[in-house]
């Protein structure tokens, strides 16, 4: 199947023939659907806290930040291109009409002066067309405006990543999501030394642009928020790219005979996450940001999630030290079992069959894992995966964040669980990545390699099958201890299309 050139290509990518064969086998056979016990809901896998508990957890987090013993990092996947944000505007450029016709097009032009990038776009139009946006619209030359927004002769927004686009207007400036993440991180993720660590994963071609922006705004942000920024970057590793298969199941070959590899999706970022030397990691998508006047809820509930995390971690560490000592009673084992099955929602029907030594070993294995606390938002029809109680390969049940592709929607019972789920995943995580002895967990050890999905694509008119790795907060964290906590919808304000920026949540006060 592979010749010497192939093996040389594998070596350069940091992979090998066995891995590639295994990936081709996965593409051929597909992935099994996950067995579900139920959708998670408040009281069944999702914790809802009251105001008094909220205050306690926030105090817990503030104390953790100020004790000077811990490092905190925010991790933001930021490599995605913004092209999908402008899908409707690209379609307008290709349309056989020249004035706004669809609801989307009309909304865009009706609100054009409200976009944070309006001044830049107007300047680009005057430079390239010798006319302002107002004049171009008066001439019904709408497509020139869109071309200057999306194309390389103008702002080039159609080719830039979301993190570098101007999202929000302020009195004397405008901010990108990159800058908004810097601003909000100073409000909940700085230690007692005032340092804010933020790590962005970016694509290689955009790294210099992100670096330039970080260098240009760090000083003013430090002055404004009273913090020092330590901003770092990494790329998705080439070794995490996955092989593409031709229609007959053999490796898809490029015109030059080389084998085609494709990025394996955001699940590959578990490798980048694994390289962070930190105790606690906040994870959030690049486009879920709001202006300063709306950040209160974001900060409050980030602190809540983090407070829950360090509270849980403290108990886990105490239990692990006790189990190591061997000085536990039957009553104490019962207490720890209750914590694992009820608080961590990790259940097994076989526990009654274990003697005390076996039970202690089982509990130790379940407790000594990375921990994540995930915010969950009440379902209001927004897109996103959902929280479930799912069966694992060892027969246990645990909390998982699942996408529709992981669920057999032909099974009416499972389809109902998915469609009638009360909550969805807004990608709002706080993670503890060191064990009770202070050593960093090797995160790839906790990936469920039997998850992922196959998608059909094409290249140069030829069909291919692509392999997506388990998603970062899906299968890549499958074997973590997980707690779901209800957070309000106000903490979830993603920008999926350019017109989302016209929502009140992205407009000035």
Language-model-derived ranges and their functions:
Residues 2-42, 354, 360-367, 372-374, ...:
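Long, compositionally biased intrinsically disordered regions
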Residues 7-14, 39-380, 389-401, 405-406, ...:
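Domain-scale recognition of functional cores that engage charged ligands
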Residues 36, 185-192, 418-420, 474-475:
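Short, flexible, solvent-exposed loop/turn segments with mixed acidic/basic and small polar residues
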Residues 132-139, 157, 287, 302-341, ...:
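Conserved catalytic alpha/beta cores of large enzymes that bind or transform nucleotide phosphates
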Residues 182-186, 411-414, 469:
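Short amphipathic beta-strand starts and helix->beta connectors
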